[in-house]
Regions:
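Extended glycan-interaction surfaces of carbohydrate-active proteins
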Residues: 3-45, 79-130, 164, 226-251, ...
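Extended, well-ordered alpha-helical scaffold segments
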Residues: 13-21, 61-76, 153-182, 190, ...
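Aromatic-rich carbohydrate-recognition surfaces in CAZymes
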Residues: 43-163, 167-175, 197-230, 254-257, ...
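Alpha-helix C-terminal capping/termination sites
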Residues: 56-59, 133, 149-152, 272-273, ...
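N-terminal amphipathic/hydrophobic targeting modules at extreme N-termini
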Residues: 182-183, 363
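Hydrophobic alpha-helical bundle architecture
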Residues: 420-423, 437-442, 446-450
Length: 504
């Protein structure tokens, strides 16, 4: 690949990175379109995993199948219909026992997406005591980003053809009618032959798809906002209600805030595109409030990084030990996200020259920049991001460029009692390393991106480490699902973002 910026410092790192990235993208293309399940023995749909896989599929141009999958997943949003939902298998408060959700529980969960959709069995599972924040937030983010990109690319003009959509339902009406409406558009198991005609019409008329999904994402946002239990701007999760679902992590988790910021920012951009400026503006303010809260409460000057505030026990007391985790890197991705609305982005401030950006969206960004409630400047956040990346490298990277998901071994795990260097206990996970690589690229740390990609694709192993679910850092042996398409797609997404942003 010829580099038009060849005279910049770090040319060799960048050139090597481009070569490795090109090879990885070419070698992994065969895995992109094998479904939205994570792969191997994971035959069902994990919502958080699907969020990354669908982005990768959309980037390769598989628009039709991606839109079908979005419809399918949002048809499983939790409400008061007859859908079978189980929960609690990962909750210590429920003794790690499966519970069947009754109408009262469904009402509590309403708006969230399940952790897993077992489509063949006709059952959805919420793994913890409550729906995990990241599954719902990441799918809101991905869905919004795909539809927003679809519209802004001129593939379809929403506003021009909206009148042709059959009886579009307003947001307020949908919220009032959610339980009854869902019985009409959704089944308790997989989409059957009766629902397929609607799906076909959705793909022929994208306005119908948008009118089906967007109101559901509004309800999802209401659910996510309700997870800020003490109204301090930070969402709280219970035990095992995130991707590390054996680590017994609960509290105000940086990774959750990042997922929520991504959801709010990307959905705001989509709403802006379809003319819902007021709601878009509210979402922007909500995202900004969370950024301010993260900077105020989750930044540790002593650690030089963003650190979770974890709860110890069911009484809600904070754990004394503060542990750095690799997934805080998602926060750095969230605050540098290059949506065309660009409400929160540090990296692209004042540099987005796209002619597709509406004047109203530009005004949102102007208001965000000049909002007197901002407590921390962009410059300070940039400095903190750089310190966080350096701290991760110092405290989490082992044996060169092999970052572990936690800086220490976990004191307790459950329901799976993990040995040291097993699964979520102090191990190397390619998928979250892809997120860290993306975060480093956002701050032009291309040499470190090259180091990480080199480790993921080293040839002195029987199989490329990037293809495994997780890796034992002591033995260097890959384990779990293989090939693990969540990891492959996340790395591909990071590489594509890095290459496109560098050359744009």
């Amino acid at each position: 690949m010829n580099d038009p910026i060849a005279r910049e410092p770090g040319q060799r790192d960048w050139s090597e990175f481009c070569d490795r990235a090109d090879r990885f993208l070419e070698n992994t293309a065969q895995y992109v379109h094998l479904g939205v399940n994570p792969g191997d023995y994971y035959t069902s749909i994990w919502t958080r995993d699907a969020a990354y896989i669908l982005r990768d599929q959309f980037l390769t141009g598989d628009t039709s199948n991606v839109l079908q999958c979005l419809y399918f997943i949002w048809a499983y949003q939790i409400d008061l219909n007859n859908q079978k939902i189980v929960y609690g298998r990962g909750s210590p408060e429920l003794n790690f026992r499966i519970q069947h959700a009754d109408s009262r529980t469904k009402e509590k969960f309403m708006g969230a997406l399940p952790s897993t959709i077992y489509q063949q069995e006709g059952i959805s599972e919420v793994y913890g005591r409550n729906p995990d924040i990241d599954s719902t937030a990441l799918m809101v983010s991905t869905t919004s980003w795909i539809l927003d990109t679809y519209l802004k690319a001129g593939l379809y003009s929403y506003c021009d053809d909206l009148k042709s959509a059959p009886n579009p339902l307003s947001f307020a009406d949908y919220i009032k009618q959610t339980p009854n409406l869902s019985k009409d558009v959704r089944q308790s198991s997989i989409l059957n032959q009766q629902s397929m005609p609607l799906l076909s019409r959705v793909l022929l008329k994208p306005a119908e798809l948008i009118e089906f999904i967007v109101p559901r994402m509004v309800v999802a946002i209401h659910y996510l906002a309700s997870r800020d239990i003490d109204n301090d701007g930070l969402l709280e999760q219970g035990y095992n209600e995130d991707w590390m679902d054996t680590a017994l992590r609960a509290g105000k988790i940086v990774y959750d805030q990042a997922s929520w910021i991504l959801a709010a920012n990307d959905f705001s951009s989509l709403l802006c595109e379809i003319g819902e400026e007021n709601m878009a503006s509210r979402l922007t303010r909500m995202a900004e409030r969370t950024v301010n809260a993260v900077e105020e409460k989750l930044w540790s000057e002593e650690d030089g990084a963003y650190i979770d505030i974890k709860y110890d026990g069911v009484d809600g007391k904070n754990e004394e030990e503060r542990m750095l985790t690799q997934d805080v890197s998602l926060y750095l991705v969230a605050i540098t996200e290059n949506s065309l609305n660009d409400n929160l982005s540090i990296r692209f401030k004042g540099r987005n020259n796209s002619h597709n950006v509406n004047d109203r969206c530009q005004s949102f960004r102007h208001n965000f920049d000049n909002n007197s409630s901002r407590r921390v400047t962009h410059k300070t956040i940039e400095e903190r991001a750089a310190r966080t990346l350096e701290t991760i490298k110092t405290r989490i990277w082992k044996d060169g460029a092999r970052p572990l998901i936690t800086e220490k071994e976990l004191k307790r795990t459950g329901p799976w009692i993990l040995d040291s260097n097993q699964y979520h206990n102090h191990t190397f996970w390619p998928w979250i390393t892809g997120i860290e690589m993306l975060a480093r690229s956002r701050f032009q740390r291309y040499g470190e991106c090259n180091d990480l990609l080199s480790e993921l694709t080293r040839e002195n192993y029987s199989q490329t480490l990037a293809y495994y679910e997780w890796v034992n850092p002591v033995t260097g042996k890959g384990s779990g699902a293989f090939p693990f398409r969540t990891g492959i797609s996340t790395i591909r997404m990071a590489l594509t973002d890095t290459l496109l942003s560098r050359y744009s």
